[in-house]
Amino acid sequence: MAITAKDVMELRKQTDCGMMECKKALTEADGNFEKAVEILRERGLATAAKKASRTAAEGMVYADYCPQCKVGVVIEVNAETDFVAKNDKFVDFVKEATKVIMKQNPADVEALMACKTEAGETVDEALKNLILVIKENIKVRRFTRYEGVCSAYVHGGGTHGILVNFETTNDIDAKDEFVAYGKDIAMQVAAANPGYVDEASVPAEVVAKEKEIMLAQMAQDPKTANKPEAVKAKMIEGKIKKFFKENCLVDQEFVKDGDMTVAQYTAKVAKDLGGEIKIVKFARFVKGEGLEKRADDFASEVASMVK
């Protein structure tokens, strides 16, 4: 199978490995992208668990929560230049779209476009009018809507948007202390980028794949290759615990106090407020995540290497 420049660029973007290493891995994997990532990880060349998040698209991410109706929304709207994110009309459109999502609960972006705004026009009409004013291509890319107690947080003027959903008892969500706690958890998600809420939410196939990669790494390391299987199993157990600690929100060290985990901080706040708190789910949007502008010079460089 022919290896293209696009394939090499994408693998490099996601693994931070050198272009020649990426080309070799893709060749060995016969063009299978996932297998190439595994090969690089097994060789210790690629970082585990998380993909690189190089962003190039402009616009903004926004998140908001209505405590009266108990609905939260995080949304991403993309544009061509970074000037747009500072334009009042653009920001107003993003906030209006967020309100529409809260109130009308559209199934997806296409359904959102057909919803009516408070001004009586559809979101699609409002968007087209905005494009005429700003003279840039603008697109609502994605959104997530949660019902129930939430915390919404926007970081970096719209580079990151976080929405965290909770279950609580005894109306503790109305207390200022809970609001502060919710912001802390949302900031934790922004800073530490967990992949899952807890160990139970990590798919079994993900854990199995991690173990497989760890064993392959051990087999290629002279220090561990000849160790007894029982010793290797114990080492794998420790590595999996580390994986959970790094990738599960409740197991992570609390960013504002490294002496406790997020789970311990949650338990402390719940006890202080006289109720119970459970982190149910979260959404973490990064502006332009997975989107790239054209980079002709870099593309030419890669193309010359895969010929």
What kind of feature is each model-predicted range?
Residues 2-307:
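N-terminal assembly/interaction segments in proteins that build large macromolecular machines
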